[in-house]
Regions:
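Conserved acetyl-CoA-binding loop-helix of GNAT-fold acetyltransferases
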Residues: 87, 92-106, 237-252
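Amide-forming acyltransferase catalytic core, primarily the GNAT-like/NAT-type
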Residues: 2-48, 54, 123-230
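Active-site/acyl-donor-binding loops of N-acyltransferases
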Residues: 115-155, 211-240, 244-305
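Acetyl-CoA-dependent GNAT
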Residues: 55-58, 64-73, 215-221
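Fungal eukaryote-biased detector of long internal structured cores
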Residues: 53, 65, 78-81, 88, ...
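Catalytic micro-motifs at enzyme active sites that drive phosphoryl/nucleotidyl and oxygen chemistry
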Residues: 38-42, 66-74, 108
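Eukaryote-biased feature marking scaffold/signaling PDZ-domain proteins and nuclear chromatin regulators
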Residues: 9, 46-48, 60, 77-80, ...
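Conserved GNAT-family N-acetyltransferase fold
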Residues: 51, 63, 85, 213, ...
């Protein structure tokens, strides 16, 4: 169903399912609040969709889809990102997940014929399909990280509704560097920033932007401590400035987060290579994105953002 038709009681059931059954390992837990889930579907230009699976009037599965704009191979199109796929642990291996995916995609296309593709993300256990991209995601403990001092002319700003135009202009001027550039709408990005789900920082010298860093509150707990994720970076400066500025942002996050995961895409390899010279990573997770109903050659990690 359309996200705006989801009832309050359904949202409560969704949160109960996600909090209890979405992702749980011995030392890693996914603990979202409703404010970490529903803003992803709000302030969208196009519709978002939720599919729910019931057994004996009890919700045992859910899946969602929300619109993203893809710039790939010199063309632009809308895809629907499949997220929050969750099946109750007592009902797994009953073919519920494949049925959810197939039914969800069919209903999306039926209600909105312009939907031609979907985008999936997989971690650890990858599919045998041809991926859009495969890369590694690294998890670090930031406790002993050092911070590099920046020159007084360097400013790091936190992006918000008042200065979002700075980021928009920087992206417009730099997205040609990547063969594939995928974004949500600006209105949705602002909603995610306002609700503390996304953080974006820009490095500015003399009113010119030289780098941007994108972070996500993943609601994931490692060893009972919160974590933050760097899911993308854009570099238009020296490696030294790029690394030093990142260290200052990480220092800020250390007040509230002990762990950080960094996806090795776009320009982030420069940061990761510097970190692993001094610190060991806790986890190295194979990660991939897949298109459904769209064929393309796999990208290199630095070609994707």
């Amino acid at each position: 169903k359309n996200y705006r038709d989801v009832t309050f009681s359904e949202k409560i059931e969704m949160m109960s399912l996600l909090q209890t059954h979405y992702y749980k390992k011995k030392y890693i837990q996914y603990k979202p609040l409703s404010s970490n889930v529903f803003p992803y579907f709000e302030n969208q230009v196009d519709n978002s969709y939720i599919s729910l699976f019931y057994k004996n009037k009890k919700m045992v599965g859910l899946i969602s889809g929300r619109p993203l704009t893809v710039n790939l191979n010199n063309s632009s199109f809308i895809t629907y990102y499949v997220d929050f796929l969750c099946v109750h642990s007592d009902h797994r291996k009953q073919n519920i997940a494949p049925e959810l995916i197939q039914t969800h995609y069919y209903n999306e296309c039926y209600k909105q014929p312009s939907i031609l593709t979907c985008l999936f993300k997989k971690e650890s256990h990858l599919n045998n399909f041809v991926p859009l991209i495969v890369y590694n995601t690294y998890t670090f403990n930031m406790k002993n990280w050092i911070t590099y001092e920046l020159h007084s002319c360097v400013n790091i700003i936190n992006i918000n509704s008042k200065n979002i135009h700075i980021l928009v202009d920087f992206i417009r001027n730099n997205k040609h560097k990547y063969k594939c550039f995928i974004t949500c709408s600006i209105s949705n990005l602002l909603k995610l920033i306002e609700t503390g789900n996304i953080y974006v920082y820009c490095v500015i010298i003399n009113k010119k932007v030289y780098a941007s860093y994108f972070f996500r509150n993943t609601s994931t707990i490692y060893f009972n401590k919160k974590s933050i994720e760097c899911f993308g970076t854009i570099q238009d400066c020296s490696d030294l400035l790029f690394i030093y500025a990142f260290s200052n942002i990480a220092y800020y996050f250390k007040e509230n987060y002990l762990f950080i995961t960094i996806e090795n895409i776009s320009n982030s390899s420069t940061i990761i290579e510097n970190i692993v010279k001094k610190h060991k990573y806790l986890y190295d997770t194979k990660t991939a994105f897949y298109f459904y109903n769209y064929a393309t050659y796999p990208l290199k990690k630095e070609e994707y953002l």
